[in-house]
Every structure is written in C-alpha cells, then in structure tokens.
C-alpha cells in the first residue's frame, strides 16, 4: 500500500502543471475597473505590496493579480506557457536570474517600451528586455544569543574555522536547498567560482549536518527561534527587515566578498496588458520606486543599493561598508550554471559533501 500511495503521489506531481502551484492575491481597482495586470513573482507579497499600491494609485482603473510561486516553479510555468504561445503573466519578476536570462534568450520576453535610467549600472540590464530592480546582498545571519561577539565570523575563512566545532553546531546551521531553490543555486554556483574557500566551506556544512531550506525566511525563522545558530547565504533584504522586528538576529556582510543579487523583471512576450507591465517596471526604477523598495521592505534598488546599505548599522559583525560587494551581472554568462552537464556535476558534488557529513 505504501508503494502504491508513493507512486500515486509521484504521478500527481508529474501531471499537475506548475501554474497550479501558484498562490494568487487580487488587488481590486480603486476606480472603475478597466484592465488587469498579472504579476508572476517569487517575492513575498509583504515586500512588494507597497510598490503595487503606488502603481494602483496612479493607475486606479487597473486591478492587479499577484501570482506568487517558488522560483523554479515560476520558471517552469512561464517557459511552458511561452513554448505553447499561451498567457501566464504580463510581467515576471524573479530572483532566479539565470532562469530569467534564459527566458529572454528563448524569446519569451519583448523589449521595454520605456527608456532605462541613464545611471543604471551596466550589470543591471540585458538586451533592453531584462532589468534588475533590486540590490540584495547574500549575508550570514546568526543568533546573538548563540554566539559571543568575539566569535562572530567576519568572512568565510573565519566561518570555516568556527564550524570546526562540530559537536556544538551539528544540525544548527541552515542554508538553501540548492536543488529546489533557484536563488540558492546561483549563490552557491557563484561561490564556487569566486571563492577559494568553497571546498572547505562545503565540507564544513556537510560535517555539521547543515539543514537545508527552500527559502531565506525559513532560515531566518530558525535563527530567530534559536533552532539554528547560523544561516549562510541568506537574502539580506529579508534578514534586514526581520532584524527590525527581532534584535536577536545578527547580520554579517562577509568582508572577503558579498554577492549582491538583483530581482530581474521582464515583460512577457504573450502579455495581455503590456502597457501596465511596462508602467510597473518603469515605476520601480523611479525615485518613488527606489524609496518604496529601499524602505521597510529593504529590497533596495539597483540604482542606489550600495549607498543605502552603507548607511545601515547591523549592530554586530562586519558592516555593509566593510563588505566588498560583487553584484551578479545579468548576462548570458549566467547560462553556464544551467548547462545540464555542469549542473549535474555541481549538484553531485553538493550531495556528496552532505552525504559524507550526514547532512540533511
């Protein structure tokens, strides 16, 4: 019976389309409804709602449907709709930027109908069809009640040294499950290509039986409750927002280098409301949009992210000003990590490290 149930579950997972896994939230038009904008996104609604509200203030006849999914499910749904010539969303906003580049490369987007800001960094756009809206560092979060101030690692070298205390940290380190998280995969892949510490760090995570999670919010919750002492490669936007609610959360901007990711937006080739899709993206790049993104949501903007981060005092650990930020450029180079052979080899190395260490 167990085998039968398991088989049926696998069959159900195979036949259910990715779009069925979406969670839709509707924002009714404040005036007489004349059109609808559908946003496909991975961002937690609470972080992007201020931008949606501002958009509707200037577009009162537009209702908005916010279609939230995990990064890989969103990509699968958009790619499937594109291949079939069907509609899924008017605009797609995702932190899984390699998948976003692939959608553009596969002809699933179209050029913007507005001019990009002249001061937009070169790394933050590609082919006038994909633009980075945010500036989000990959940080280390830790439990201030679980680490003494003098123990807080300032960089990856010190983190590897700290994790030698396996009896103390076993099962109490959290990071992304890179097999199920697009943003987790890109952070890990970039680490492997940029850091001489990657092999030792991966070994340390495995030896400490690091726990794997789908999302930054789950890792942060683990630290906040004391179940985890430390979380690696967490999105700084989520961590900074949660730290304002709970000072128990400490944040580290690694001083050796701090990756910065930009949630990228495109207009779908099969969008039904291309006007509104362009208007929303253009709004995010204005002074008003930057203020909303850099406010309580802490997403920050691709236009002013470094300057805004340098003003932040995390209260402990290396400050943003000490970090060597390395933004991940929106370019075809990101497609290397999606090559099937390279992805398989990378994931095999990941699994092997965790299996040898007994990690989750």
What are the residue ranges of the model-derived segments?
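A bilobed periplasmic-binding-protein/Venus flytrap-type ligand-binding module shared by bacterial periplasmic
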Residues: 139-146, 187-189, 261-274, 292-293
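Paired acidic/hydrophobic, glycine-rich loop segments that form the ligand-binding mouth/hinge
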Residues: 85-94, 212, 229-234, 250-251
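Early extracytoplasmic/lumenal segment of secretory-pathway proteins
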Residues: 22-101
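Short beta-strand->loop
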Residues: 110-118, 129-132, 247-259, 268-271
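Extracytoplasmic ligand-binding site segments that recognize negatively charged/polar headgroups
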Residues: 42-49, 87-88, 94-224
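A ligand-binding cleft/hinge motif common to bilobed small-molecule-binding domains
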Residues: 98-102, 224, 228-248
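Mature extracytoplasmic/periplasmic domains
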Residues: 268-330
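Conserved C-terminal helix/tail region of periplasmic/extracytoplasmic solute-binding proteins
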Residues: 327-360
